[in-house]
Regions:
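Conserved phosphate- and dinucleotide-binding cores of soluble alpha/beta proteins
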Residues: 1, 80-250
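N-terminal active-site beta-alpha-beta segment that forms phosphate/nucleotide-binding
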Residues: 5-117, 222, 230-250
Length: 250
């Protein structure tokens, strides 16, 4: 049928990816494929692009092909998960884009969340970590998925987000995250113990990145995506048509 599009106050008119399957993985793959196909149009020689890991981005890595640009710098905008238990392909995505953009990948050499706010503050001052975070703030493009607050996420299952963090975030009204930064239904950052222990850029810093590409699929992302758009954390959206139509309905 005709390709539907969505108009939202915080987005240009956005074509939606046709939903051709009832299998969530297939829908996710189609959305990732559409976003990956357009990636080169957002990049120039020497562009700095930030990526955040997660299930959607792990899938995205499979569809990246030569970008026709050179010297692209790819930087991880959130620290590593405890990858021993749950592979998330954080490095796969950075490496795939770096190869396709004939450039280099930089990771934040630290876990996404550490044991205390004090350790987080110290680590953010450590030379290599500080350099990676500085580069992340200099991105012209950020590429990320949208997470909902759920125990079935890599963040929770890997132990980076503890049960007490989950309960605190829930009590404070968190509905989802981008780049492991949680926000409430109005799209406002939720301050929490987890936020203080996190090694990543902040939502305020993300907001300053000119080109923010959000990739999302599945109706369970509805509330989180709606809030992320209210918060203006996404200005280029790739979503399936079922999810996109829900945004108009809210």
């Amino acid at each position: 049928g005709p390709s539907h599009s969505v108009t939202h106050p915080n987005l240009p008119e956005t074509p939606l990816v046709p939903k051709l399957s009832d299998a969530p993985v297939a829908v996710q793959e189609d959305v990732c494929r559409a976003a990956a196909k357009d990636l080169s149009s957002y990049l120039n020689d020497g562009s700095i692009i930030g990526t955040a890991w997660g299930r959607t981005m792990k899938s995205f890595a499979n569809y990246v092909s030569d970008l026709g640009v050179h010297n692209v710098k790819v930087v991880q905008i959130n620290g590593k998960t405890n990858e021993t238990s749950v592979p998330v392909g954080a490095d796969d995505l950075s490496q795939a884009i770096a190869r396709a953009g004939h450039g280099e990948a930089y990771v934040i050499p630290a876990p996404v969340a550490v044991d205390s706010a004090e350790i987080a503050e110290m680590l953010k001052k450590e030379r290599n970590i500080s350099a990676a975070l500085t580069l992340a703030r200099e991105c012209q493009i950020a590429l990320f998925g949208v997470g909902n607050l759920s125990r079935n996420t890599i963040l929770y299952r890997s132990g980076s987000l503890k049960e007490e963090d989950f309960i605190e975030l829930e009590e404070k009204g968190a509905v989802g995250d981008v780049c492991t930064c949680f926000f409430d239904a109005r799209g406002e950052a939720v301050s929490s113990s987890f936020a203080k222990r996190r090694i990543s850029i902040t939502l305020e810093e993300l907001k300053k990145i000119p080109c923010k590409i959000g990739v999302a699929s599945g109706l369970e992302k509805k509330e989180a995506l709606h809030a992320a758009l209210l918060g203006e954390y996404i200005n280029i959206l790739y979503a399936d048509e079922e999810l996109g139509k829900e945004l108009i309905a809210i």
